[in-house]
C-alpha cells in the first residue's frame, strides 16, 4: 500500500521551498513555542516570521533567530560575570569597617571620661586619746588643696603631762579648715601600749 503523498509524517516528504526549515535549531534554553521561548512565531503570507522578544527584531529563518538568541545569551553571561567581578573587587578594596577605638576601657576602677579620679581626696578621720584621759578625740581631715594664707597665727601651748610638750594645731596647720574646738592637739606617731603621744619638741625659751 502506497503512502499518501500529502502525509506530513512521511520522512520522505521534503518541502518544496528549501529556504524553509521544518526543524529549526535553537540553543539550549530556548524553545520553538511562542509561550515559553524567547521569540514569537507568526504565520504570514510569505511564510513564518520569528520575532525576538528582547529586541523585537524579526527573522524569516529560524537559524538566524537562533544565532541572534545566542548573542543575547552571551551578553547576559558577560553582564553576570562583570557584576560578580565588581562585587569581588569591592569586597577586596573596602574591608569591613572597623569603628574607632572605644574609650570605655578601664584600668582598675578608673574609667576614661570619668572625673571621679580628679575629685579631692580626703584623709580618713583619726581617732586618738589624750594621755591620762579616757576621752577620744577625732581630728577633722583637711582639704587636699589648702589656701595660700591663713587668717589665724600659729600658737604653741604647753600641756602638762610629765613635762611633755604638745603643739596645738590651729586653722593654719589644718590647711585652713576650722576645727570644732581650739583645744584639739596634734598627736604624733603611735607608740606601744596602743596609746599615741606627741613627738618631743625643743624647749620654748619665750616663756
UniProtKB/Swiss-Prot annotation:
Region feature (Disordered): 1-20
Tissue expression notes: Expressed in the emerging leaf, stamen and carpel primordia. Not expressed in the apical shoot meristem (SAM).
CC terms in the record's Gene Ontology section: nucleus
Positions annotated as zinc finger (C2H2-type): 50-72
Subcellular location: Nucleus
Cited InterPro entries: JAGGED/SL1-like, Znf_C2H2_sf, Znf_C2H2_type
Sequence ranges of Low complexity compositional bias: 1-16
Coiled coil: none
One annotated GO molecular function: DNA-binding transcription factor activity
Superkingdom in the source lineage: Eukaryota
Family matches, as SUPFAM superfamilies: beta-beta-alpha zinc fingers
Consequence of gene disruption: No visible phenotype under normal growth condition.
Keyword vocabulary terms for this entry: Developmental protein, Differentiation, Metal-binding, Nucleus, Zinc, Zinc-finger
GO biological process: anther development; carpel development; cell differentiation; stamen development
Main localisation: nucleus
Purpose: Acts with JAG to promote growth and patterning in stamens and carpels. Promotes the growth of the abaxial and adaxial sides of floral organs. Promotes the growth of the pollen-bearing microsporangia in anthers, the carpel walls of the gynoecium and the establishment of the correct number of cell layers in carpel walls. Promotes leaf blade growth and trichome development.
Protein name: Zinc finger protein JAGGED-like
Gene from which the chain derives: JGL
